[in-house]
Amino acid sequence: MFMINLLLMIVPILLAVAFLTLVERKVLGYMQLRKGPNVVGPYGLLQPIADAIKLFTKEPLRPLTSSISMFIIAPILALALALTMWTPLPMPYPLINMNLGVLFMLAMSSLAVYSILWSGWASNSKYALIGALRAVAQTISYEVTLAIILLSVLLLNGSFTLPTLITTQEHMWLIIPSWPLAMMWFISTLAETNRAPFDLTEGESELVSGFNVEYAGGPFALFFLAEYANIIMMNIFTTILFLGAFHNPLMPELYTINFVTKSMLLTISFLWVRASYPRFRYDQLMHLLWKNFLPLTLALCMWHVTMPIITAGVPPLT
């Protein structure tokens, strides 16, 4: 039975990822005053299927000097971790209801760094290695603020369990009392998922394509799927943390509709940001985090520690 539940979660995620690639190309197309893909199927709707067939039927080339095992394991690990991070998300009921769901998600997102590092190192190409080092430095740096922001939100929530966030936000979204955190969280998720304007890992002008430059066909598609699954997952996480939808146990469908709408709007805002902003310089990216975000989040975390105590507000303890 559990395997059926797992499949019922994984298949829709992969479908959502496939169509997110199409939505991205369409949105970017219309923002640049062109049509986007419109040849394969009606309005280009079958484009993701054509892309998948093309990628998975290509020969998976590998460089002669690469270390084979790591080269093959890295993309599989990337996708496996991206899908694992969905398990504790309440939509409205999680696949596995964990006591420390938030901690689990932080741990999984930290492990994702290894797949990037291995892929860059195993490719044995200087471009891939530089791209991987950039990606790792960026991901690890922005995880610091993500963790502190999470801690601040959880101080209002009262536990590390994700479903209690729904109870916490029955009367008010957490974006209202902690909007500076929400803004920094959104920008940090952009950096964490390597999206524009923080897509330094795949700076075409200087690094050709970044850490996945030596990958072709199937393994490349796995990295691609992992990246987009992470984007959707991060937006869903943002919705749960800051824009909690109202959950009526008698009609869980209403929660799902509400929640999916918010997550889709956030995902489209990711694409909007990509179409609007130029790429950051690497030192600007690091300055933004270590000199702007970190002091601010630390100060706000201390404020979130004191605020419930001052107002004698007890978080929901159920």
UniProtKB/Swiss-Prot annotation:
BP-aspect Gene Ontology terms: mitochondrial electron transport, NADH to ubiquinone; mitochondrial respiratory chain complex I assembly
Subunit structure: Core subunit of respiratory chain NADH dehydrogenase (Complex I) which is composed of 45 different subunits.
Protein topology in the membrane: Multi-pass membrane protein
Keywords, comma-separated and alphabetical: Electron transport, Membrane, Mitochondrion, Mitochondrion inner membrane, NAD, Respiratory chain, Translocase, Transmembrane, Transmembrane helix, Transport, Ubiquinone
Protein name according to UniProt: NADH-ubiquinone oxidoreductase chain 1
Family (UniProt): Belongs to the complex I subunit 1 family.
Function: Core subunit of the mitochondrial membrane respiratory chain NADH dehydrogenase (Complex I) which catalyzes electron transfer from NADH through the respiratory chain, using ubiquinone as an electron acceptor. Essential for the catalytic activity and assembly of complex I.
Catalytic activity: a ubiquinone + NADH + 5 H(+)(in) = a ubiquinol + NAD(+) + 4 H(+)(out)
InterPro entries named in the record: NADH_UbQ_OxRdtase_su1/FPO (IPR001694), NADH_UbQ_OxRdtase_su1_CS (IPR018086)
Lineage: Eukaryota, Metazoa, Chordata, Craniata, Vertebrata
EC number: 7.1.1.2
Top-rank lineage group of the source organism: Eukaryota
Family matches, as PANTHER family: NADH DEHYDROGENASE SUBUNIT 1, NADH-UBIQUINONE OXIDOREDUCTASE CHAIN 1
Residues annotated as transmembrane: 2-22, 68-88, 100-120, 146-166, 171-191, 222-242, 253-273, 293-313
Cell compartments where the protein resides: Mitochondrion inner membrane
Gene Ontology molecular function: NADH dehydrogenase (ubiquinone) activity
GO cellular component, one term: mitochondrial inner membrane
